[in-house]
Amino acid sequence: MDFLISTSLSESTSTSADFCVVCGDKAIGKHYGAVACNGCKGFFRRSVWQNLQYTCRFNKQCNIDKDHRNACRYCRFQKCLADGMKPEAIQNERDRIGSTKRRKRSGANSENNSDSEGTPSPKIEVMGNSVSRKLIEMLLDIEHRLASNQSMNALLRDESEMKNSRQRAVNYLIGWTNMLHPLPEVPLADKVLLLKKFSSAFTLLGTLQRSMALPHFVLPNDQVLSISASHPPELFEALTRIIDELLTPLRRLRTDHAEFSCLKALLLLNPDVVGISNNTRERIREARDALLKTLFAYMSNTQNSIDASLRVSSLLMIIPSLISVSSSIMEFPALSDLFGLGDVIKRDTISPKIETPPLEMKPMMPKIAQPPVTSAPTVPTNIMMNKDLISQIMNNPQLFPLLPMPQTASPPMSFMGQSEFGCHLQSMPVKVILS
């Protein structure tokens, strides 16, 4: 989706009044039906173009003057309307401008027309609300399909596998990979590189999402891990780092489900992974750029452009910490098993295989005791597979019928590449068992 970029047309000025009827600042002419300064003109146009909704934190009678006009956007917008500014005048201006894709920005006009107070800059209009909403809904639908799929739930909540966080995490990850465009269509070798790079961070992000409103961690197998000073120092330090660097920022932002889904998709849609093909790199870059525009548009529905930009930046800054923390957890096998952060693919093998695991998942960290969790006894009833993990799952959907897969290998393209999904290929799911 392309950004729509336009610069406003020069407007006729008026010398009949010297002061803005909204805030009392020096006026630059008559705009949208009222004599206004450049700041109030830009504020009113932004509010109407982006359909921004404001709220007043006080009694809806805030003083709007030159020094306090930015204190309450709700009262400022209401004063714009009360003093004669007409929203329909802005629509008429947009009609005169026409399609911005066929226009070149004019430097002379941009100097005389500005959406900011004091600093001229071109107006950026993000993709339409309906388009961005559609992509957000599609990402949320991936989460819903994975959470509500009866075959998956029956498999992952089997009494004999209640302890296996890693098992649940890898099934969840590959479910996303099978549904997020363009990953189902990229070469196998590129999928391997992407999953090797970001599987741990992706899984940890899911645990953070489940733990947002709770004082403890909710692991992939729905068990609870509490933080206690009685834990060994190394373990306590690792858990504290998760809280300080990840959970606290996410809670401070009050990250919602849509934003979590976007973060998960952004983790997997990283075009900078070393070794992927140029064609895959370009396809992933296009999908990522569309997702970033969508995330900005989603946030712009409830706040102004500056605040939306800051929020997008704050969320993106969490990704490097997510990758760093998940890598550090991998140094403690017992803890990484609990969080389901085991590698999907063995990093030290050129042709990755699924090795036969021991009958019971045992901690491999002698110096750090595994944190106590409530669990059921483990019964070794796993189905073993000894062929290439990724090729079996990605290239043969019948080995992983946990999701409604496309009926063709390359489904008809719609927004972000998603089309209608077919029925289950097989009623009995097969589980991928990892060592």
UniProtKB/Swiss-Prot annotation:
Keyword annotations: DNA-binding, Metal-binding, Nucleus, Receptor, Transcription, Transcription regulation, Zinc, Zinc-finger
Entry GO MF terms: nuclear receptor activity; RNA polymerase II cis-regulatory region sequence-specific DNA binding; steroid hormone binding; zinc ion binding
GO CC, alphabetical: nucleus
Gene3D superfamilies: Erythroid Transcription Factor GATA-1, subunit A, Retinoid X Receptor
Main localization (coarse): nucleus
Mapped zinc finger ranges (NR C4-type): 20-40, 56-80
Biased composition regions of type Polar residues, renumbered to the chain: 107-119
Chain residue ranges for the region called Disordered: 91-126
Subcellular location(s) per record: Nucleus
Pfam families reported for this sequence: Hormone_recep (PF00104), zf-C4 (PF00105)
Phenotype reported upon loss of the gene: RNAi-mediated knockdown causes enhanced resistance to infection with the Gram-negative bacterium P.aeruginosa. Knockdown suppresses the developmental delay phenotype of hif-1 mutants when grown under iron limiting conditions.
Tissue expression notes: Expressed in intestine and head neurons in young adults.
Top-level taxonomic group: Eukaryota
Positions of the NR LBD domain: 131-355
GO terms, biological process: cell differentiation; defense response to Gram-negative bacterium; negative regulation of protein localization to nucleus; regulation of innate immune response; regulation of transcription by RNA polymerase II
Start-end of DNA-binding region: 17-92
Keyword check for ATP-binding: no
Record-stated family: Belongs to the nuclear hormone receptor family.
Protein name (record): Nuclear hormone receptor family member nhr-14
Organism whose genome encodes this protein: Caenorhabditis elegans
Species lineage: Eukaryota, Metazoa, Ecdysozoa, Nematoda, Chromadorea
